[in-house]
């Protein structure tokens, strides 16, 4: 039956900035013929509560135009020089729906299993002021190489699979189609 169709369809709409969405709705009210490009002038893209850096606009455009798209999100990091001549990677934002404790555990596991060499310590210094995961590096290690390895082997870089379905007048539509209703 129809209920079975709904059960097989999983909606996964990324969170957005409420102010931008309101501006987009006002745009649609003022101009009922506005295009998705017009809306994207107001709604820039997802606004993930854990932050992160969205890589490129392609996945966002696909999601808005077709109702589904793959949005690549990467942790926000800084490379800092320490007084002892070594470097550290500081993670201040992580991709949406990534569990911070599991991320730290995974990095420690990769170091323990010697799948990542060059990390001397990892600790979570997060507090009420915000997220702060500190990854201290050994001497003479290239921080960017370690960082790229972390992106590849951990959830410091993830893909958010947007599936923007809506129920409109009893019909299941992608939000790009629902806007035409």
Where are the predicted features?
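A short, contiguous, amphipathic alpha-helix enriched in charged residues
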Residues: 93-117
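Hydrophobic side chains in well-ordered alpha-helices
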Residues: 21, 103-106, 146
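Short hinge/gating elements
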Residues: 4-11, 84-93, 131-136, 165
């Amino acid at each position: 039956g129809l209920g079975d169709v709904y059960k097989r369809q999983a909606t996964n709409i990324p969170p957005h900035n409420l102010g931008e969405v309101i501006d987009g709705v006002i745009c649609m009210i003022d101009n009922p013929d506005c295009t998705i490009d017009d809306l994207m002038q107001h709604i820039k893209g997802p606004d993930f509560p854990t932050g992160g850096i969205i890589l490129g606009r392609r996945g966002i455009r696909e999601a808005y135009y077709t109702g589904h798209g793959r949005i690549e999100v990467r942790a926000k990091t800084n490379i800092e020089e320490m007084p002892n001549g070594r470097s550290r990677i500081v993670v201040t934002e992580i991709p949406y729906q990534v569990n911070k404790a599991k991320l730290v555990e995974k990095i420690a596991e990769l170091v323990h299993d010697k799948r990542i060499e060059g990390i001397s310590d990892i600790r979570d210094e997060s507090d009420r002021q915000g997220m702060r995961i500190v990854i201290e590096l050994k001497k003479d290690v290239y921080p960017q190489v370690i960082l790229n390895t972390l992106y590849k082997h951990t959830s410091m870089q993830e893909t958010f699979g947007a599936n923007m379905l809506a129920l409109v007048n009893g019909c299941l539509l992608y939000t790009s189609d629902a806007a035409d209703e």
